């Protein structure tokens, strides 16, 4: 007997939406594609979806609601923009109040979800926010330190290939920094978080690189390092191209020579530096676009776990 699957629609037929569609078609265990929704009739994503036998519309969320199979759609991934997501969520809830929304924009109208850190707490949420690519890569590392020692401050720098940043990413730079900074605090456990994104124009394009600086209370270095390595291995379960680029680095900040952190004041304790790289699985996007791959992989892992819980309830 075939396993029952939940039907998913994707709004946004750009880089992220198309990669996500291919992941669901190839690897969906509890999910299957129901519809691909865009606003550009000439988009490659819609053409690809049609070729793969997926229902499509270029009329946005209204087009989705008008599709004959809309009644069967259980989960909607939104890969548009922060502003569009707010409208999409409101409109879909007018028609189907209980629909599940997985938000891949920085809108964050629902609670943040970083699968390896807090997915089990989000299984009943009707709208979850996948933070940002930088957040999905770095917040697990902040949380790894946080479970060993109190984290006073965490700063992340996400460097992504300029070529992998489509119009949606570029339009949402401010939202990226705000949402990631907030999630570093809410999910990562830092008292204060800061996020910086760098679009690297290098050719040939470089894979995603992330640097995480964590200032915490004094702690056992071996315990912190073990926690970080364990967390990295957990992320690799759904993002195989995620890895520590080099050994974790530690610096003691003595009370006699404290750091001055804006908004926090003087700090002494342990500084932990983590260097990451994320290579994409190259399902649709090139391997250098690890920043987009980690978003689609995290979104799929989240929706699969939610679908599994719903189907076995």
From Swiss-Prot:
Q: Name one Pfam family in it.
A: AcetDehyd-dimer
Task: Cite the InterPro entries for this sequence.
Answer: Acetaldehyde_dehydrogenase (IPR003361), Acetylaldehyde_DH_C (IPR015426), NAD(P)-bd_dom_sf (IPR036291), Semialdehyde_DH_NAD-bd (IPR000534)
The GO molecular function terms of this record are:
acetaldehyde dehydrogenase (acetylating) activity; NAD binding
Task: Please give the biological process terms from Gene Ontology that the record holds.
Answer: catabolic process
CDD domains found in the cross-reference section: ALDH_C
Catalytic site positions: 133
What does the UniProt keyword field contain?
Aromatic hydrocarbons catabolism, NAD, Oxidoreductase
Annotated NAD(+) binding lies at: 13-16, 164-172, 291
Name the catalysed reactions. Answer: acetaldehyde + NAD(+) + CoA = acetyl-CoA + NADH + H(+)
User: Is-annotated flag, keyword NAD?
Assistant: yes
Q: Does the keyword Nucleus apply?
A: no
State the family named in the UniProt similarity comment for this chain. Belongs to the acetaldehyde dehydrogenase family.
Please report the name of this protein according to its UniProt entry: Acetaldehyde dehydrogenase
Organism equals Cupriavidus pinatubonensis (strain JMP 134 / LMG 1197)
